[in-house]
Amino acid sequence: MSSSRNFDLEYDDYKERRNAAGMGSRASSRNGGRFKPIDKEKEKEKKEIGDYGLPKNEYKMQGYDERSSDVGADPLASVRTLRNNLRVMSLEHRDKDEPVKSHLCQSACDDLSKAEKQLVDLSHKRSDAVVRGDSRQAEQIAKDMDRVKSDAIRNAYSDLMMEDGTMKAFGVNSKWTPDKNPMPSDDWKPMTPMKPRKRAETPKGRKTESRQSNRGNNDNGDQRMTSKATTRSPERRVIPTEPSKPKTTRKNQRLSTIGHVPEAIPVVDTPLPGGSTVQDDPYKMPTYVGRCPHCQLTESGLGRAGGMEKHFAKYCKVMTSCKYCMKLTMVSQLTDHLIYRCEFLQDTMEACNDCGLAIEKEDQKRGGSHPMCRGRRPPTGAQWCPLCTIAVEDNEENWREHLLNNCYNNQRRDGPEKDPWEMKQEQEDILLGAKEKKKREMEEEERLKKEAEIRRQQQQVVVNNTGYPGKMIDADKLVVALQEIQERKKAEKKKKLKDIEKET
């Protein structure tokens, strides 16, 4: 009994302290039962997220800034230019055996290609808005194009792969761009502190006096001069042991050449690029003669700056230009260029299993062949000419002889090689002329059919009116026939008159 009483007293004391602390309302439940702790899961469900008062800071990029530039003015052109540059870098890294950088550049090209499609669609929409006269929509679409361009350049991470100057041309200023000429780590050395300079010590036996003390009270300088003369030690005279040489009298450079006959300037044999020599006479006009190292053509103008490059581009018969990437290459190396080095084809061709010339991989997988296939390998020590498929001994002299004299399919034998764009334009003009000629022939045929139909209808009208299915009379032919009849009658009448006169 005593224990239960003590417990009741303690419980009453607990309730008083609890009510004094303000917890009575929480302890009393709706059902009036005793207070029980809530489960943790229910407590989480009832707890609401409060406002903690955190500032809403906008995200700002550090080290990456964009601005307007000449190259980045047109979003579509800037994206295409950047994609082409990254594609070239991907090929260069692949040739240098750097697969990671090559993969990064190629993935950036893929992202930029997707952005290019979006920009093309937006450009069409903007053109339609301009045609309709909706300037607000056109301006909004232009802003969307700039946003797509900025997002594409930033998400492609091109600033991590391209140089600082190239990215600034696109309006991107990033501190993450690699330095073009980084300083090697071995060359860096910490700066050493400069050693303090030592002050010159004054001799002990010499007195130091200021200039003010040396000056006299008078303004005249005689006293100063006399004091210096007295303190100066007498000069020591040196007696020469050898007689001095006479000095040469210097003359003016122009006066010294008066009356002096210059020596003849020798004629120098200047070697040409091909190995031959030409007499370069300084008293005559320059010849600018040069020799092509490939076709051995010696011509005036090849020695001039840019003359040899122009000769290689259109006139050298030993070289040709790839019809896919427009790069110059030797004819003897054209097959290897198409298979391994052409940037436009990008490993889409391989060597033919039958002849060894270039063929598309898809055609060879399907079992097809190319039009110039000879069906067998070239003889030992020779190669097929990629222009005419004639076997040529694989050395420089035989290739030169073949391309200058024997290759019937060498376009440069008859003159300079035409620009592929000009050739394409000529082909289009020929096709257009043939199409127009066919159109004129069809129009002429249609006109003749209409005339025949009109004549048939006129003949049918005559038949319906007269009941006689006669032929239509040509008025011109009728007039000619009547004139012939009249001329014949006149001739007969004159003949009769002459006969009458003879009888009389």
Swiss-Prot record:
Residues 213-232 have a biased composition (Polar residues). It comes from the Eukaryota. Residues 1-59, 171-255 are annotated as: Disordered. It comes from Caenorhabditis elegans. This is Uncharacterized protein C40H1.3. Residues 36-50, 199-212 have a biased composition (Basic and acidic residues). The gene is cepr-104.1.
